[in-house]
């Protein structure tokens, strides 16, 4: 992790939902985030540090209510760790640059990877 800020700095920078999702690993409600049904062409960046994370060309409708992608923009931007919360074992996805919680990755996605990166809209900022 190369970008580190104090809790107060993150709170000043982020909205309440962005802070809860990215810094406290909360999950936004399905079908409520700004990007779950967003199909413009461009890049989805980390809301905390601006790192490019996902390209719109890898986004697909998984029917789950969260933005879903079959691959990150490259292998250097995402960190994965085992998450034992809520009585489940899942793989948490974090921004490698700032440690922001993004969501989880599952092995039920489409070709070519077979992966579904299920990401909270509050963890993302869309742009070019």
Swiss-Prot record:
Q: What is its EC number?
A: 1.8.4.12
Q: Where does Zn(2+) bind?
A: 46, 49, 95, 98
Tell me the cofactor note.
Answer: Binds 1 zinc ion per subunit. The zinc ion is important for the structural integrity of the protein.
Pfam families, A to Z: SelR
Gene3D superfamilies in UniProt: Peptide methionine sulfoxide reductase
The active site of this protein is located at 118
Q: What is the uppermost EC class here?
A: oxidoreductase
Residue ranges of every copy of the MsrB domain listed in the record: 7-128
List the GO molecular function terms.
Answer: peptide-methionine (R)-S-oxide reductase activity; zinc ion binding
Cofactor(s), by name: Zn(2+)
- The question of whether Zinc is a record keyword is answered with yes
Sorted alphabetically, the keyword list is: Metal-binding, Oxidoreductase, Zinc
Per the record, the GO terms for biological process are: protein repair; response to oxidative stress
- Reaction catalysed by this enzyme: L-methionyl-[protein] + [thioredoxin]-disulfide + H2O = L-methionyl-(R)-S-oxide-[protein] + [thioredoxin]-dithiol
Which family does the record assign? Answer: Belongs to the MsrB Met sulfoxide reductase family.
Q: What is this protein called?
A: Peptide methionine sulfoxide reductase MsrB
Gene symbol here is msrB
């Amino acid at each position: 992790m190369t970008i580190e800020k104090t809790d107060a700095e993150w709170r000043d920078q982020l909205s309440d939902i962005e802070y809860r999702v990215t810094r406290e690993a909360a999950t936004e409600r399905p079908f409520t985030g700004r990007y779950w049904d967003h199909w413009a062409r461009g890049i989805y960046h980390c809301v905390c540090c601006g790192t490019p994370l996902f390209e719109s060309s890898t986004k697909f409708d998984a029917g789950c209510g969260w933005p879903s992608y079959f691959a990150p923009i490259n292998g250097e931007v995402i960190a994965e760790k085992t998450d034992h919360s809520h009585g489940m074992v899942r793989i948490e996805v974090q921004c490698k640059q700032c440690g922001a919680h993004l969501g989880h990755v599952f092995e039920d996605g489409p070709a070519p990877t077979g992966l579904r990166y299920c990401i909270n809209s509050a963890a993302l900022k869309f742009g070019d």
